[in-house]
Amino acid sequence: MPFLPITKEETEALGWDCPDFVLVTGDAYVDHPTFGPAIISRLLESKGYRVAMLAQPDWKTDRDFTRFGKPRLGFMVSAGNIDSMVAHYTAARRRRSDDAYSPGNRPGLRPDRAVTVYAKKIRELYPDSPIILGGLEASLRRFAHYDYWDDAIRPSVLVESGADLLTYGMGERQSVEIADRLAAGEPVSSLRDIRGTCYLIPTKEYEPGPAVDCPSYEQVCASKREYAISCRKQQDEQDAVRGKRLLQKHGKMLLVQNPPALPLDGAELDAIYELPYMRTWHPCYADQGGVPAIQEVEFSITHNRGCFGGCNFCAIAFHQGRMVTTRSEESVLREAKLLTQLPNCLLYTSPSPRDCS
């Protein structure tokens, strides 16, 4: 299956007047199932939607963001596979000299706090176009949070970015439901009941219902104890079965987190990982040496999602949930057979360390 279009000329060659969605990512375009933007774009494609890829746009000008014009349904925005600040800085707060998720290991091709910068640029250019945030950076910054690089509490990324919706955790279910409802003519402002999403509304517009109140942004800024209480409540409601809606005030606005999306079952995971990925970086990066991040995962196989561990140093349980779901043996074997047919295939694979727990 060919790569998804990355230029206006490619969309025109496909006979598109405009894409349904433009998926903006801070990583180079790698069509591989270990890259979140690849999964979401291929899944939407499988549902009949036209998706164009805008990888590492130049945020200092309008040119890249106007490449495809205004999409029919909206923009989906991700910083990429990791937080843009982690991509840019070491634990000593020093600027990194490389970026494995960029062509040729070249640093500086995405901005700091990428989802916020991208969303603001899109809002400036297309004020009425829906903007949906997703990916790790958006997901882990959805509440008021401590930022290591600022050494301060920052508000929800929804407050800073001005986006309409945020999908948190693994985003397949949410993305398809959002796409289907936008395609049916629902305004993005009405999409307030989708599991696995967050949104902002004026506090006075919130209709009371079963929910858990977190300490406000102002409270967590002023008190470490209130910050700890907020974090505990967020962790307590991460269960997809019993988790409740969470609320957190930011001034006159209210952040609403709907309960987590239900995890995909085995058959759904099989379908996701058997979508027609090209399983490598886009050929436009060939003369730059490709994208180094693919090297560790090119011949890997994802067997399961979720983790019961909840280790302090790891965000997997908070992002993927504690419920572990697995693919079928038949699906894993089909993928293994497919890998053996790829050029330069390594005829062995090993588990991720986290899967050995």
Stretch-by-stretch model annotation:
Residues G36, A55-H250, Q257:
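Glycine-rich beta-alpha loop elements in corrinoid/cobalamin-binding modules
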